[in-house]
UniProtKB/Swiss-Prot annotation:
It is found in: Cytoplasm. It catalyses: alpha-D-glucose 6-phosphate = beta-D-fructose 6-phosphate. The keyword Ribonucleoprotein does not apply. SUPFAM superfamilies: SIS domain. This is Glucose-6-phosphate isomerase. Catalyzes the reversible isomerization of glucose-6-phosphate to fructose-6-phosphate. It comes from Xylella fastidiosa (strain Temecula1 / ATCC 700964). The lineage of its organism: Bacteria, Pseudomonadati, Pseudomonadota, Gammaproteobacteria, Lysobacterales. PANTHER family: GLUCOSE-6-PHOSPHATE ISOMERASE. Belongs to the GPI family. The keyword Hydrolase does not apply.
Amino acid sequence: MHNGFDALQLHANRLRGVTIPDLLAAELKRPEQYARQVGPLYFNFARQKYDCVALEALFALARNHNVTGAFQRMFCGEQVNVTEGRAVLHTALRGDLSGTSVAVAAYTAAAKVRERMYALIAGLDASEVTDIVSVGIGGSDLGPRLVVDALRPISQGRFRVHFVSNVDGAAMRRTLDMLDPSRTAGILISKTFGTQETLLNGRILYDWLGGSERLYAVTANPERAANAFDIVPTQVLPIWDWVGGRYSLWSAVGFPIALAIGSQRFEELLAGAAEFDAYALRVPLEENVAVLHGLTAVWNRNFLGCATYAVMAYDQRLALLPTYLQQLVMESLGKRVKCDGTPVDRDTVPVWWGGVGTDVQHSFFQALHQGTNIVPADFIGTIRNDDLYTENHFALNANLLAQIEVLANGQLSDNPHRVYPGGNPSTLILLDALTPQALGGLIAMYEHSVYVQSVIWGINAFDQFGVELGKHLAVQLLPALKGESVEVADPVTRAVLLRLRG
């Protein structure tokens, strides 16, 4: 059989007419057997549409593709980013697990950079600066923005951090209009310092601050940062080519995180991720949540034919998690060729999307309950929320449980307009509390789940060539928008350029 895929297709065919309530009735211990606790994180896969026999076939698929060996190669610093010839060592930013010379060197370098970062924070603490403007886009923005927003209520930092990513000048203006330049510092985050959005927004910030005295950079190209913005070397923090943007919040890209929540909280975030790394590397496939989560995604995509995947965060502090995961998953897995350049032989990543509960119940949940598509989902909540509004938290979690149950089980009615067909599989993820440790572990779990899927599909999760062509074309079209004579081949683009130029 084709590396286990044919056997799994037989199981999918066998289960086609089986409902999720049927599975729960057939496996009475399913709620416990399909649950896992990893530190402060609880996972329950009982409402996924597979049984124990199909699940064993999924684990066989993982063994056939040597997922365990793939984890070991990544953690040891082998060049698993084969298209760019690079190691992938974001895990070494938060811990040394493999003991190889490459990983140890990476961990040591990252620790030294954090020491420098904390020294810069101490210097800012002694100044009159109260606000930080962080300029970056994609992985230089989404991760830090998520963590700062999620952990703001337990922050130990004294700085208010404001994020600007969009090249639309309205975003920068809206931010600067509420700040005092004499009490503001800026951070420009770009691996290459060639990102158009960051350079344009950085120039606005440089001018508004009156120079580079309170301007910092996080980059793998310090010379370009110095040339473009006169940023002195002592205010530049390095990053490396073995850390991809969407995996970089653990590096100096996390500078705005540490400023916002404090150095100790940032270390707790790293520790939570490192704890999950150790778990992912050492726990057998059959018990490994990251492997199970990744295999479940493959099952829903390739054997149930689900073209989208939703993330529902039932905690307002995690409102940015669906957007963060959208980049992590779709930029990593949105590939049409394998590592060897041959076309993939099955569908890869579905469209990831989502929102925050209970708001989503009043927007797109109608389509989930009574539409024509089956949409697998992750529901993410917190067990304990140490705020003043405990009644609200009870109501939030009641809605969380109710929606999962109805989406899976449905409800019949004599009135066709009131039929809930059910059949939507979901995974429940609960954090004991939204702490830096729990958030770090949660993000690490998703990183490793993505890697598992990439190994099964035979694709490279660590490049993103698909984002390049549009950026290059935009640079070529910019002079034409300014009125310069530029040859434009596409007839529609030519016509629209004339309208944009007035």
